[in-house]
Amino acid sequence: MDIQRSILIVALAVVSYLLVLQWNKDYGQPELPAASASMNTTQGLPDTPSAAGTSSDVPTAQSGAAGSEAADKPVAVSDKLIQVKTDVLDLAIDPRGGDIVQLGLLQYPRRLDRPDVPFPLFDNGRERTYLAQSGLTGADGPDASSAGRPLFHSAQGSYQLADGQNELVVDLSFSRDGVNYIKRFTFHRGLKADCSDKEKAQKKIECINENAYQVGVSYLIDNQSGKTWSGNLFAQLKRDGSADPSSTTATGVSTYLGAAVWTPDSPYKKISTKDMDKEQFKESVQGGWVAWLQHYFVTAWVPTKGEQHQVMTRKDGQGNYIVGFTGPTLSVPAGGKVETDLTLYAGPKLQKHLKELSPGLELTVDYGFLWFIAQPIFWLLQHIHSLIGNWGWSIIALTVLIKLAFFPLSAASYRSMARMRAVSPKMQAIKEQHGDDRQKMSQAMMELYKKEKINPLGGCLPILVQMPVFLSLYWVLLESVEMRQAPWLGWITDLSVKDPFFILPIVMGGTMLIQQMLNPTPPDPMQAKVMKLMPIIFTFFFLWFPAGLVLYWVVNNVLSIAQQWYITRKIEAAAKTA
């Protein structure tokens, strides 16, 4: 049984490592293209964001493909961006096209040592291109005009959500050929007023409004021309091939960076940049959403429910990757008015809010193939946090609950190990008796197990059952934005990254060593040497694992030691009195 147990432990380490390698292969960040790399290092480029640049950004209403890049000339960059600030968002809108070209998340600092610098989700400078575009294309759409994308006018150069104000509306206006357009952005207060500053700092889900990171975008079309106006609403996300700035793990693990869409056949369909390099994706869907994913954060366009849209992905001539959709044809008679709208989500992957916004959008929190186990674990962890208010202590409480759930299985395993420890002298005698005759030795061992009523797999099955739970918890701690920059106590200021002083991994190695002392010594000398190396090997691996995961492993080991010691002493005491 000890050999089988050792094989299982080694298998767990190997399987975990292979899963990491496979995840990187499937979902790792793409290498920065040579063209983009040279562009980023070019000197003299402006630091301020620029407009999209060409009308080739605009899809055609019929196919969703790119426009003619050869025929379209660059559009002049607008002189001044429109600044908008709420309690959770700090963004900039380019009047040329009305695109959101900058967006910072005020509640999520880029680094712990710089809490005043928000994490930059959108950017359109020399370092990175990532922005949200929307407009009107088609026969009479202003974004499809040969004159270039419309230059909107705003009554103010900056807008800010005032104290006590729950909604902020920003109107951009434009007129052409007798048609008046208003592009309206609606922003919402992110944090609930009845929550304390401490609760807001803890980012409790109960303190975040469900529309905190939703931006309403609507077009009001007033046709004062003498003919019927016809056009299509489009929305898309454009990003270059740069690396994920939110990926901070030190284990070599890269979470998925790429596009995803909702389709009738798949509520969560990934379309990586490698897929876009090969071919365009096009499909007609009703409702749904299109999104761009990165570690911890997501951006998604959600169209009007019930309408048919043409979803597409493509790669433009500048090496940027685009995912978006084009809506059905709108018709506005002369003298008539029409309003059409959609929603932009730009923020953290808050599963509850994403699910309420659109079905399937919560799946952008990608827990891998064990999602059906990971989601209940996260649900329980989140509810514990709502009571405790600290993610570190919540992980400890979750570990205790998981240990209690597996108590019967663990107890059976430890009882089997205790019996094995009791008969280890007999096992050693069998080995000495049969020497190198492994067949006879195995037969004698099985007879001994049968006589002593020992199940040789009794210590293995509990480990096999708990493997999926461990792997699921790994992805919960790695993928959940709630763990980002979440402190525990003392030196652990961020549970999502490695322990800066490696204290937890060393403690974990110590607990593994104590566990070995409680287990029977393997009869095989080579196996005994391998088992002695396991604490060192695991300690080395866990040096770069997220502190939250190492904390779980340490607490689990401590509870296992206590449980094993209690059961072993109980069995030994019963044997003495028998």
From Swiss-Prot:
Q: Where is the composition biased (Polar residues)?
A: 37-65
Membrane topology type: Multi-pass membrane protein
A single Pfam family, by name?
60KD_IMP
For this protein, the record's InterPro entries field holds:
Membr_insert_YidC, Membr_insert_YidC_N, YidC/ALB3/OXA1/COX18, YidC/Oxa/ALB_C, YidC_ALB_C, YidC_periplasmic_sf
What are the transmembrane regions? 3-23, 361-381, 387-407, 457-477, 500-520, 535-555
Does this UniProt record's set of keywords contain Manganese? Answer: no
Q: Where in the cell is it found?
A: Cell inner membrane
Stretch forming the signal peptide: none
Which keywords does this Swiss-Prot/TrEMBL entry list?
Answer: Cell inner membrane, Cell membrane, Chaperone, Membrane, Protein transport, Transmembrane, Transmembrane helix, Transport
Predominant place of localization? membrane
Q: Which GO terms describe its cellular component?
A: plasma membrane
> What processes does the entry annotate via GO biological process terms?
protein insertion into membrane; protein transport
The answer to whether keyword Electron transport applies is no
The record's function comment reads: Required for the insertion and/or proper folding and/or complex formation of integral membrane proteins into the membrane. Involved in integration of membrane proteins that insert both dependently and independently of the Sec translocase complex, as well as at least some lipoproteins. Aids folding of multispanning membrane proteins.
What does the subunit comment say? Interacts with the Sec translocase complex via SecD. Specifically interacts with transmembrane segments of nascent integral membrane proteins during membrane integration.
* Family membership: Belongs to the OXA1/ALB3/YidC family. Type 1 subfamily.
Which HAMAP family does this UniProt record tie to the protein? YidC_type1 (MF_01810)
Q: What is this protein called?
A: Membrane protein insertase YidC
Q: Which organism is it from?
A: Pseudomonas paraeruginosa (strain DSM 24068 / PA7)
Which gene name does the record give? yidC
